[in-house]
């Protein structure tokens, strides 16, 4: 039996001979860290849409993935309502955005998950979305409804075993996208976002390595900013953010507040460094047509056309 001291000594000997854990864990140990393994890829475009379950969008995708169990062409899954009555999955009658949607909050998402049972979607709608038809939590779309998404799923790699970084709403998961951490944020509460990750964001790394990037927005940022600031937490957020901005660069608050809710502002204290990288969607299309896109493009759609 190898003792703890012997194991540590063995690891040190391995590291001295170039076989340390980091070296062994690399997929191509013979290449230096950071070597370009796919040089033919010159541009990366990232589009992050709204929160949906796999089954909700692609559960009826035949031949790929682990979607809905089907009997005679109809999904068989059920969830109980508050009275214990089983509620079957329902084909959504329309792709039009509903005025009310099932909540994606931390609390609601954990009710839906139900300790791994994934049978709390009706209960979540009943408990967290007053006035919402509880059946909305059991709706799904088919290829006839979403031909573009199904076409993508059939043509390109599809992550059929992918799980969100945070079992919760938009802001924490978009923070994970750009920083690998939500910094403790679990809900869409703007006044809890006046912070910055200790290791920075992907934008900091792109700047450090001289890699070109741009964040394109689909909706004039001033309108998005007003929508964010006008909800229940908005005034508190505005006061905190305004004070922080005034302390950083007097007179710049108006400029930065006009560019809220692009991906780069999920950590607002870093937005100052990103202002020159923000651009309207029209410039994305123009750059794409000319073959002049930056190495990394983040695309934020028009959030008035919500896809929740």
Briefly describe each language-model feature range.
Residues 1-308:
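N-terminal pro-sequences and low-complexity stem/linker regions of secreted or lumenal proteins
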């Amino acid at each position: 039996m190898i003792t703890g001291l012997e194991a540590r000594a063995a690891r040190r000997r391995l590291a001295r001979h170039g076989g340390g854990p980091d070296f062994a864990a690399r997929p191509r140990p013979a290449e230096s860290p950071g070597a370009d393994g796919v040089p033919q890829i010159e541009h990366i475009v990232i589009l992050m849409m709204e929160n949906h379950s796999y089954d909700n969008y692609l559960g009826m995708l035949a031949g790929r993935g682990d979607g809905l169990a089907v009997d005679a062409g109809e999904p068989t899954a059920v969830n109980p309502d508050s009275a214990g009555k089983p509620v079957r999955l329902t084909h959504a009658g329309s792709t039009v955005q509903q005025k009310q949607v099932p909540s994606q909050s931390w609390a609601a998402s954990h009710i839906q998950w139900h300790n791994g049972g994934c049978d709390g979607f009706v209960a979540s709608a009943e408990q967290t979305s007053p006035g919402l038809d509880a059946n909305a939590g059991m709706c799904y779309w088919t290829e006839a409804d979403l031909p573009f998404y199904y076409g993508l799923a059939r043509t390109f790699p599809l992550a059929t075993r992918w799980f969100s970084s945070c079992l919760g709403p938009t802001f924490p998961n978009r923070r994970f996208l750009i920083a690998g951490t939500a910094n403790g944020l679990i809900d869409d509460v703007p006044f809890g976002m006046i912070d910055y990750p200790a290791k920075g964001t992907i934008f900091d790394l792109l700047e450090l390595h001289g890699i070109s990037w741009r964040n394109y927005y689909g909706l004039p940022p001033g309108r998005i900013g007003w929508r964010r600031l006008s909800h229940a937490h908005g005034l508190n957020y505005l006061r905190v953010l305004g004070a922080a901005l005034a302390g950083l660069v007097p007179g710049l608050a108006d400029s930065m507040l006009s560019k809220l809710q692009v991906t780069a502002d999920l950590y607002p204290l870093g937005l100052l460094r990103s202002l020159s990288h923000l651009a309207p969607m029209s410039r994305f299309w123009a750059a794409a047509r000319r073959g002049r896109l930056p190495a990394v493009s983040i695309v934020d759609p028009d959030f008035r056309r919500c896809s929740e």
